[in-house]
Design a protein with these regions (language model features):
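Positively charged n-region of N-terminal signal peptides that target proteins for export
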Residues: 1-5
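Sec-dependent N-terminal signal peptides
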Residues: 7-12
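C-terminal motif of bacterial Sec signal peptides marking the signal peptidase cleavage site
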Residues: 16-19
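Subset-of-secretome marker
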Residues: 21-287
């Protein structure tokens, strides 16, 4: 169960990071809305409050994030899981909190993660991720992860930092998507389920070079519902936050897992992360 949980957290974070790091121009066709594109008859005040179409919002967000050099993201993930294996059943709650400081080029990431699973001691992990190494601290011990174990993960992280047409994937669910506004933010809302969300996740993960294990996990999923909410600042057109709620089930090796999950991510410190310095004890662990 823990392996499945960890894999799925990474899948969701890859999508979330890609949305904040996108640097290409997309041409997604917006769904039908009541927001006409013509300004005829509108007063200046009306024009100022007009909600952009999906295409306009994606284009402006791409332009803004292309110039962004660094940012911080924080995520909180709550999962309620039920595992059935024959006549045995197990319920488990998992709470994960994650904070990442990210410099895009050259890629440098510092992250702190805490995972709490019911009935187990909380696990705290600190990591520094560069373009070719991962230094990890569990407890008081720093270790340099062997290159053979990190190469694929680093390539996936690089792809998420500079995706090719990442938001273009939302065309696959445009009939389930609408643009609204809340306070200082524009909001992209998507309510999807079944094959639509599975195809969206597959397309994004294939583009980010996800491994065979992640693809196999997606093939086994039956997602009954998934709601996504992307908040984009009206003034800067930079991502502000994302909310994801999902109910899904999957089977593997005769075991059936049902999961109810809520994930909230926030983005801040745009262009304010100036330096990430790896501590000497972490560097010494690679010697």
């Amino acid at each position: 169960m823990k392996k499945w949980t960890t894999l799925f957290i990474w899948a969701l974070l890859a999508v979330s990071l890609a949305a904040c790091s996108n640097d290409t121009d997309n041409t997604a066709t917006p769904p039908a809305t009541n927001n006409e594109t013509s300004n005829e008859g509108n007063t200046p005040a009306e024009q100022e409050t007009k909600i952009p179409t999906l295409d306009e919002l994606i284009t402006k967000t791409n332009a803004a994030t292309k110039e962004m050099k660094s940012f911080t993201t924080e995520a909180n993930i709550d999962q309620n899981l039920k595992l059935d294996a024959g006549e045995q059943s197990q319920d488990q709650q998992v709470k994960t909190s994650l904070k990442m400081d990210i410099i895009k080029d050259p890629m440098m990431i510092y992250q702190e993660m805490k995972m709490e699973m019911s009935g187990q001691e909380a696990q705290n992990v600190k990591q520094y991720i560069t373009s070719d190494k991962i230094y990890s601290q569990v407890g008081d011990q720093w270790v340099a992860i062997p290159e053979a174990q990190t190469k694929e993960l680093i390539e996936q992280m690089k792809a998420s930092m500079n995706p090719e047409g990442e938001l273009e994937q939302f065309k696959k669910i445009e009939e389930d998507t609408e643009v609204t506004e809340e306070g200082d933010n524009y909001v992209i809302n998507a309510d999807v389920s079944g094959d639509n969300v599975k195809e969206l996740a597959k397309a994004v993960m294939e583009q980010n070079g996800s491994d065979a294990q992640m693809q196999a996990m997606l093939d086994q999923m039956n997602i009954t519902s998934m709601k996504m909410k992307y908040m984009i600042n009206k003034e800067t057109y930079l991502p502000a936050s994302t909310d994801v709620t999902m109910v899904m089930e999957m089977e593997q090796n005769g075991q059936k897992m049902t999961m109810d999950m809520k994930m909230n991510s926030t983005f801040s410190n745009q262009d304010q992360v100036e330096e990430i310095k790896i501590p000497q004890e972490a560097l010494d662990s690679a010697k």
